Amino acid sequence: MLNKKNTFEDYITSAKFLIEKKYTYNGGIIGYGGSAGGLLMGAVVNKAPELFLGMVIQVGFLDSLTTNLDHSLPLSLGELTEFGDGKGNPDHFKYLKSYSPYHNIKQMDYPNLLLVTNLKDARVLFDEPTKFTAKLRQYKTDKNLLL
C-alpha cells in the first residue's frame, strides 16, 4: 500500500519515453483520467506539468487525504487496503499527504485544465474537483485555461 507513488512515476516515465522517441514533444501530451485515474492526473500534473499541453480530469479523486481520513464515507473503509489508513497510522498519513493532488498544488505554471464534477457520483465527492480548482486559481502562475 505504500507503493502508490510508483503509479505516478511510471506515468511520468512513460510520457518522457514518448517524448524521447519523438512520438510527441515536451508540453504536447494531453492527459485524461476520472475517479482514481483523476488522482493519477492530479498527482502527475503537480509533479511534471511541463510534460502536458492539457489535461481533462473527470470527477477526480483529488483530495485523497481528506477523504481517507473520513471513515464515515462509504468507500473510505473499503479503500484502506489500497491507500492506507491516514487516520490510524502516522506513516500512512505522511505518505498520503505526499501525493494527494489538492495538498501538493504549488505556485507554478500548469497546463490547460478541464475539471468536471458530478453531484451524484457514488465514488468521489463533488467537492474534490471544486476545491482543487479553487486552490489552483489561487496558486497557478500562468494564463492557461482552467475550466
Predicted regions and their residues:
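Active-site-proximal cap/loop segments of hydrolase catalytic domains
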Residues: 1-147
